[in-house]
């Protein structure tokens, strides 16, 4: 049926999906056309990681001000918060198809503005427009696919949206790598997003509106016509009847609680089942962001440079691994989430995340401790005014290399020109400038400004990849699944919307603060901080989030009516009652 129980994407359903879409390619056309919104979502959140490296080269103020770098990245997230919040109203008022078309226009405007930006503030404006589109696409694309898919394969089709998001991120890294040596590098990287937006806009013009939205607007004949193209003739009447009952029930609920946003919000927080559902739903969404995942996706080339790889091209090539692993993890999740359960996958994922973050903190700490020393003679071999001002007094007195190292040099906002003999040998601490970088390179040396040459760099890449491997199948996809199941039917849209906004707000906080945190605490301290946040998140997931695998919506509602308690607390409570009875 169009409305009802949980749509699961199990092995049988995937087989049925291929069989049905082979017989009725129109269904796949609907799903893939709408799914381009997920691809755009992933592309625009991932492309900035590589583009930022070259934006810093073109604009000195961006290179010198970490808050400006953070703002360029996070303004898309700020726009997404608004896009997701307003998107719900646009979806209900103008329809799913129109919402996707509006999102495409916003994507295109943002891409054009960024591609031709003459100054950093114009890039920020473009990122805000892109954010509006991302926010709308994040909620509209899966909604359209769900409402325009046959029930028996809905789970399989909707689950591809998550795969397209991670696929879009992977595609963005490929594009970044492709334009490394092209004049205008970052302008091409950011502008390419306009191409799939145009493609989706054209495709959606020839596709229909969601049959559910049409029925809700009393355009019943149009709704039937679409269902007749999706379902076999002998199933259309049953679908129409299910649609009728669902819409009538929805209207009856609105008559009781009112259809205004404030009335629905009051009804939700006055309902203990919804409150407990929101506690679980918001917990998993906030935890998803505070494990630090989007700092890895947004800043992975920068993190690779923190690990000691100076080349932009090398950094982007290595960070391509993280996005590829993320996409692979989405496929793994689709295979196992209905076999092992949502709660178990998230808890296992969180344990792995915490372990990887602690190891990464240790690796970066050791890299900082064992960073190459600064040699006074090496620093003086350049022009008199080329030595870093903070190190100049030590260079003048010919201080021994043990006094300063590369990491201290970089924290003084200077650059490190590695020894031409061996990159880990003592080098020079010099002024941070393009001229100095060119001078250093002309002598056959490597210039470092974001990280120091390190023997630990390979370990950092390995555990960064392992972090993605343990994140993607659990905390990467399951929070969205939980939020589609945890709320009563009449509050699912509102509850999911509140949880989605909490996700984007958390995303904004983390992405806006990451570079400032690495500047203040170092990479090691920042990863350790995320490990602490992840530990807190693990505790609240264990405490508040029930297992919803295999449960119908009514069963989830009954579970939340009595309140969820972890098995450990239930056993202790039972033991306490037995002692009292004795």
Curated annotation (Swiss-Prot):
Broad class of the protein's primary localization: membrane
Pfam families membership = Sugar_tr
Instruction: Keywords in alphabetical order, please.
Output: Cell membrane, Membrane, Symport, Transmembrane, Transmembrane helix, Transport
**Tissue expression profile of the protein:** Highly expressed in pollen and phloem companion cells.
Q: Which PROSITE patterns match?
A: MFS, SUGAR_TRANSPORT_1, SUGAR_TRANSPORT_2
**Gene Ontology CC terms:** plasma membrane
| Sequence intervals crossing the membrane | 35-55, 70-90, 105-125, 128-148, 162-182, 188-208, 290-310, 317-337, 345-365, 456-476, 494-514, 525-545
Top-level taxonomic group? Eukaryota
Q: Which NCBIfam families match?
A: SP (TIGR00879)
What the record says about family reads: Belongs to the major facilitator superfamily. Sugar transporter (TC 2.A.1.1) family.
Quote the protein name from its UniProt record: Inositol transporter 4
What species is this protein from? Arabidopsis thaliana (Mouse-ear cress)
- Kindly list the organism's lineage: Eukaryota, Viridiplantae, Streptophyta, Embryophyta, Tracheophyta
């Amino acid at each position: 049926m169009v409305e009802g129980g949980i749509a699961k994407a199990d092995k049988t359903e995937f087989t049925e999906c291929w069989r049905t879409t082979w017989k009725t390619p129109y269904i796949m056309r609907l799903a893939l056309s709408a799914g381009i919104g997920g691809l755009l979502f992933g592309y625009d959140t991932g492309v900035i990681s590589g583009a930022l490296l070259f934006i810093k080269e073109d604009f000195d103020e961006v290179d010198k001000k970490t808050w400006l770098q953070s703002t360029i990245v996070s303004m898309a997230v700020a726009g997404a918060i608004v896009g997701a919040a307003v998107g719900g109203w646009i979806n209900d008022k103008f329809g799913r198809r129109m919402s996707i078309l509006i999102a495409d226009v916003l994507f295109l405007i943002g891409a054009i503005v960024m591609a031709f930006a003459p100054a950093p503030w114009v890039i920020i404006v473009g990122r805000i427009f892109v954010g509006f589109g991302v926010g709308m696409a994040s909620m509209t694309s899966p909604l359209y696919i769900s409402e325009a898919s046959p029930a028996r394969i809905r789970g399989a089709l909707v689950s591809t949206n998550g795969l397209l998001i991670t696929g879009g991120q992977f595609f963005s890294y490929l594009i970044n790598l492709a334009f490394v040596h092209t004049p205008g590098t970052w302008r091409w990287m950011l502008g390419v997003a306009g191409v799939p937006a145009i493609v989706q806009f054209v495709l959606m013009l020839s596709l229909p509106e969601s049959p559910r939205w049409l029925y809700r607007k009393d355009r019943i004949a149009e709704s039937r016509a679409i269902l007749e193209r999706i379902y076999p003739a002998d199933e259309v009447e049953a679908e129409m009847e299910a649609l009728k009952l669902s819409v009538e029930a929805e209207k009856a609920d609105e008559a009781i609680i009112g259809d205004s946003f404030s009335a629905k919000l009051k009804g939700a927080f006055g309902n203990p089942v919804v409150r407990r559902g929101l506690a679980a739903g918001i917990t998993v969404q906030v935890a998803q962001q505070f494990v630090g995942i989007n700092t890895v996706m947004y800043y992975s080339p920068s993190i690779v440079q923190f690990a000691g790889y100076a080349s932009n091209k090398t950094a982007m090539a290595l960070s391509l691994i993280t996005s590829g692993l993320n996409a692979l993890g989405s496929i793994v999740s689709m295979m196992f989430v209905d076999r092992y359960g949502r709660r178990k996958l998230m808890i296992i994922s969180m344990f792995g995340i915490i372990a990887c973050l602690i190891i990464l903190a240790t690796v970066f700490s050791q890299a900082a401790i064992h960073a190459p020393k600064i040699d006074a003679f090496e620093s003086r071999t350049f022009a008199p005014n080329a030595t870093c001002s903070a190190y100049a007094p030590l260079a003048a007195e010919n201080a021994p290399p043990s006094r300063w190292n590369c990491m201290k040099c970089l924290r003084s906002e200077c650059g490190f020109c590695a020894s031409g003999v061996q990159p880990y040998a003592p080098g020079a601490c010099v002024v941070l400038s393009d001229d100095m970088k060119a001078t250093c390179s002309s002598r056959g040396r490597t210039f470092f400004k974001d990280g120091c040459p390190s023997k630990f760099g390979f370990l950092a890449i390995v555990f960064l990849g392992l972090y993605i491997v343990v994140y993607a199948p659990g905390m990467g996809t399951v929070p969205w699944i939980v939020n589609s199941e945890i709320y009563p039917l009449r509050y699912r849209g509102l509850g999911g919307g509140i949880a989605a906004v909490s996700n984007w707000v958390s995303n904004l906080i983390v992405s806006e603060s990451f570079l400032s945190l690495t500047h203040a605490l170092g990479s090691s301290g920042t990863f350790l901080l995320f490990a602490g946040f992840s530990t807190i998140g693990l505790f609240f997931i264990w405490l508040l989030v029930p297992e919803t695998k295999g449960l119908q919506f009514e069963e989830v509602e009954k579970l939340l009516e009595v309140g969820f308690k972890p098995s450990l607390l239930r056993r202790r409570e039972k033991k306490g009652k037995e002692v009292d009875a004795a």
